[in-house]
Amino acid sequence: LHAKTEQNSIKILFLQKISAMAYSWGDDRRYNSYSAYFRRRFGERVQKVAINAGFSCPNRDGKVGFGGCTFCNNEAFTPSYCQPSKSITQQIEEGIEFHRRRYRKASSYLAYFQSFSNTYAPLEILRSRYDEALSHPEVIGAVIGTRPDCVSEEILDYFAELAKSNYV
């Protein structure tokens, strides 16, 4: 019984020591949460505002397949304000209002190009849509969802240029 109690005491001390450690990201959690990362990086709560920029995907338009991927059901995770018939600016404005009602602490936003493959278009179109989003005064950066086979060197160069003055 004494040996078992001693073992339990050692386990408890070990767990306390682990939980008291600060990890390289400055937190005592074993993982670096996205919200904590943004709070450290920007000094405030940052909220993603989803945007549907009207892009398609090679698994939808016939280049690779039809019907899309099983896991990519945009209707399941797209907010009601997020419609490709609306301008990027209008979606951002409506998204910010939505998040202000829901998360009152957010004061800066990331334009989240979420629906489908957001690099599956000519660079001029991408540039126009990303620039429109990044020109909004409350948007501090962009999060761009895509497929690796839809990212060219030219697009990567553009992202590198954007990243000099924006969070990308």
Q: Across the structure, where does each feature detected by a protein language model lie?
A:
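Acidic (Asp/Glu)-rich catalytic clusters
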Residues: 100, 131-137, 159-167
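Short, Gly/Pro- and small/polar-rich lid/capping loops
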Residues: 20-40
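Distinct, well-ordered alpha-helical segments
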Residues: 123-131, 152-162
